[in-house]
Amino acid sequence: MISASSSKYDMIMKASVSLFTERGFDATTIPMIAERAHVGTGTIYRYFDSKETLVNVLFQESIQRFTEKLKQDVSELPVREGFHHVFCCLVQFTKESDYALFFLETKKDAHYLNHTSKKMIENLTQMLDDYFNKGKAEGVIRSLPSNVLIAIVLGAFLKIYQLVQTGDIEMDTDLITELEQCCWDAIKLHSSQK
């Protein structure tokens, strides 16, 4: 059985990530979070001393969950297999939390992130950078900067996922497979480019 305090914490976190994603950090207030989470404002302050603390805990938990999904160093896998692994992790992560991936992407350079949050995203970005550098060195991935390659893949994935959230398309196995292949085709070095 889930304790009431654990349940309240979870409700606060879910309400926070959705509001921060929808409205942004500055336009979201603690009373709005409390209303959406169906808890009192004071309850939020029992867990977090400020909105900045709340957003950093949320950010760090999201980064940690995604990093745990990756589990292994993708730079040690064959390049195409590493891409498949990262892509599957993106799919799993968004299925578990509709807003978490959007939150991580839109807030990664935010002024209110503390040192720990910035360090965690830096570590994740470095892991992906190592993977892309390996692929570029092996002549498998285009020689674009890693942040551009990440933007190509993540941008396409996030836009498709927005269409899923609005009900415009259904995310099924065939779509996931085709989307992965499209993203891979966008970043791989084609034989005519060598």
Swiss-Prot record:
Keyword Transcription regulation: yes
Function recorded in the entry: Negatively regulates the transcription of the fatR-cypB operon. Is displaced from its operator by a range of fatty acids such as oleate, linoleate and phytanate, thereby allowing transcription of the fatR-cypB operon.
One GO molecular-function entry: DNA-binding transcription factor activity
Alphabetized UniProt keyword annotations: DNA-binding, Repressor, Transcription, Transcription regulation
Organism: Bacillus subtilis (strain 168)
Protein name from the UniProt record: HTH-type transcriptional repressor FatR
Domain HTH tetR-type: residue ranges: 6-66
GO terms for biological process, alphabetical: regulation of DNA-templated transcription
DNA-binding region, residue range(s): 29-48
